Amino acid sequence: TITVDETVLPLIQAQADVFQNKYDATIKLVPKSEAETLNDLFNGKTGVAVLTRNLSEKEKINFSQKKIIPKITNFAIDAIALVRNKTSNDTLLALKDVIEFMKGNSSNAIKGLVFDNPNSSTVSYIKKLARVDVLPENGVYSFKSNEEVIKFVSENNGMIGVIGVNWISEPSSKMLPYLENINVLSVKALNGSSFVSPTQNNIAEGTYPLARDLFIVNCQGYSGLGMGFASFIAGDVGQRIVLKSGLLPVR
């Protein structure tokens, strides 16, 4: 069983499909929020997890106290995409407006921010960016999955959805009708002068401001299926799958 940050599930599902075919192995992916994924690792409920950030020093110390040395492999660069309903022709958004909104200040540009889960990696990323510990009381909505965010935004004007970019770059067939009703926004960095969209090229050039590294964390301590899957993702075939999925391989 591998616990996967829900915001990058499409990419890891694609990896698992190829891996299982190639090695005649069975991998069970369990999508969860970042907080739940980390809890599962700490409590030994899962030996392998995919995260959208590295472990913090404090988290590494927690593991070492349990005599566990996690093997951490950086395998891709991902991006957080901001999406809005097509009824608004405006496809631009300044990051400073998002940060002001997260601080509880009203903004003409944003009617509401929609996240997949209050404990998700997208929430913790934007909270860290805005330097806030709690979400504002008004105007922030959260659901259970990136798919629900896409559906909600496609049906509600003025809302801005915060999702993993691979939900757009590798959509499932059932999501296509909803994706037709949303625009992916170009974002202006805090000290930037231009608006940049989350394309593979812009992520590669480092110009898109909401990029993040993806890691597979292995706490199994022995060379099991998890170790094999981590090696596969970081190897040639896995890196080609990353490229095909619209994200950036690390090599």
Language-model segments: residues:
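Exported/periplasmic ABC-transporter solute-binding proteins
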Residues: 1-24, 28, 34-35, 39-42, ...
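Residue-level marker for beta-strand->alpha-helix junctions and adjacent short loops that shape enzyme
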Residues: 34, 53-56
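Short, Asp-centered acidic motifs that coordinate Mg2+ and/or phosphate
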Residues: 47-50, 159-161
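Short beta-strand elements of ligand-binding domains
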Residues: 49-52, 76
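Hinge/lid segment of periplasmic solute-binding proteins
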Residues: 55-68
